[in-house]
Regions:
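Acidic, Ser/Thr-rich low-complexity segments on the non-lumenal side of membrane proteins
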Residues: 1-11, 158-185
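Generic structural motif recognizing short loop/turn segments at the entrances and edges of beta-strands
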Residues: 14, 26, 148, 178-180
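Alpha-helical transmembrane anchor segments
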Residues: 81-173
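Structured inter-helical modules in multipass membrane proteins
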Residues: 1-89
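Short coil/turn segments at secondary-structure boundaries
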Residues: 16-22, 152-154, 174-175
Length: 185
């Protein structure tokens, strides 16, 4: 699920990761869908339903697992909304103009109190506000591959390693380090 979600958010091809993790017939079925990540959730739901019908899962365990699949569906929906909802141009424009206007008028507001220190304080405060404006633009798409984007490869690798370790499947894949400057703490 996590690898497929990563590919969906980055608009890349999930085939290689799916083939590495799943049997070929499942990969073919998943890739035939227009929404592979949703298909994975559906298949997982079908699988736990079959286990329940076969008596291999209790009703309580089935209910808990079904709730977890619902939570994953909510995560998927939230990530899709973040990835596909653009910041309105008017919002970006008003934010930039407000920051520039504030930085332009700031020295006039400070000169009465700070006198000769006004340029230094104004530059420092203006730099901070202009940096926040630039940072907001940089973080608009957190799922990409730019330096300040989320390290999805490292996050998916951590999830995969944890699941394989919990189920006793060894050897574990090599640990991926976070992408670029982002640290997982």
């Amino acid at each position: 699920f996590s690898w497929s979600l990563k590919h969906q958010l980055r608009k890349t091809d999930p085939t290689a990761d799916l083939r590495r993790l799943l049997p070929e017939e499942r990969v073919t079925e998943i890739l035939a869908s227009s929404m592979p990540t949703n298909r994975i959730l559906l298949l997982a739901g079908n699988e736990i339903g079959q286990l329940r019908e076969a008596g291999k899962l209790s009703d309580i365990t089935y209910g808990l697992m079904d709730n977890k699949l619902d939570e994953l569906a909510h995560v998927l929906g939230g990530c899709e909304r973040l990835a596909t909802t653009p910041v309105p141009f008017a919002y970006t424009l008003i934010l930039q103009r407000t920051v520039y206007l504030f930085c332009t008028l700031l020295p006039f507001a400070l000169v009465g109190d700070l006198h000769y220190m006004t340029p230094f304080v104004s530059v420092f405060i203006s730099y901070t506000f202009l940096s926040w404006d630039s940072l907001a633009e940089e973080l608009e798409d957190p799922f990409g591959t730019a330096a300040n984007d989320l390290p999805l490869n490292a996050m998916c690798n951590t999830i995969e390693r944890n699941l394989l370790d919990m189920t006793g499947q060894h050897p574990l894949p090599e640990t991926l380090r976070p992408d670029r400057y982002f640290n997982l703490t």
